[in-house]
Amino acid sequence: MEQKDENSKSKSQIVVAVRPVYPRMLSGDGRPRKFRDDEDETSSQASSAISLEEGNINRRKPKCVYISFVTTLIRRLAPPPGHSGLQHIVETWKEPDSNGAFKFDWRDDISRDIVPKNCHSHNDYWRRVPLYEALAAGCVSIEADVWLTEDKELLVSHSWQSTTKERTLRSLYLDPLTNIFENRNVSAASTDDKQTGMFDSDPNTSTILLIDFKTDGHELWPVVLSQLQPFRDKNWLTYYDGEKLIQGPLTIVGTGNTPFDLVQQNSTDRFIFFDAPLLSLSSSSDGDKYNTTNSYYASTNMKAAIGRIWPHTTHKLSSKQVDTIQSQIKAAEDKGLKSRYWDTPPWPIALRDNVWSTLMDAGVGMLNVDDLVSASRWNWGWCVVAGIALCGNS
């Protein structure tokens, strides 16, 4: 009987040394494995494979939940897509070619449901669709850097090395604007004294074209003037007649190497205005020469205005920096000029949005932006949720 019990015991529990098969097992116990009556080495390894697969699935679950959470947040908080004629142009636009600017079929809903906003499309020509993207977002101000060629053409680019003969001030900006204003001013709603502007929701809003003179200003000046003259002839430009300022649907501002003496020169039909230095407005020697008869903007580099911005945990400007901004903006307001700060921090997103909010709360004249969609259509307070950046560069 004792022998029978022994055989029975050895049958039910046999000790076998098994070498690990799966890499994760190498970190486990190397001692001999014990199998059940109904288990051998093959079935044990299969069981281990299943448990490992289940483990991998379980590890993927938190990642899937996170992705689903972010996707839902973006879907719920993101602004709805636009359906205006301008947005249609953005979706179908093509680069200028040897035939000139991209030509589009006019639609009466060109700016339908677009609310104009005091935002400036910084370095607009870098966008996938210059001009139209900014207008579709509702930004009323657009920037173009121009370079003069030997044959008196105005090329648009941030640097001379990246210029191309097809991308000119005419093909990217002047010809498209001509097309828009011609179609906007064919009805009885517009008269010789009052031309209709860009936006249906506020046709009295003037669109601003900021032209950054990159080469010698005195050489550029007559060429820029001649290309803008057709706009003046059609009464589309804001101008100063020597006594009063008459607003048109398009306002031209010169910056960079724009010569202030030439801006001042035409005292009876001035239609290019100056981008005044914001930090000089409080100066007793220079401040008095800039006003609404010769200038439109008063701009400065953000760092030059308030010093370095440290992206610390609060993502906010110091109280001293806020006070400085408020006094600078007031100095511009007192002269009737629109303040503008360029080179604001693009990142971290929370810092960027707080700087934007601080500037708007202080009454900045024009918000200089690179990210059009975030600036014009998102609720800035929802751009970062639970540490997740839902809106960024667009």
Regions found by a protein language model. Give the residues of each.
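Glycine-rich phosphate-binding loop at the start of an alpha helix
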Residues: 128
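Non-catalytic positions within long, well-ordered alpha-helices that form the structural scaffold/packing
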Residues: 135-136, 360
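Short, glycine/acidic-enriched loop or turn micro-motifs at the edges of active sites
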Residues: 148
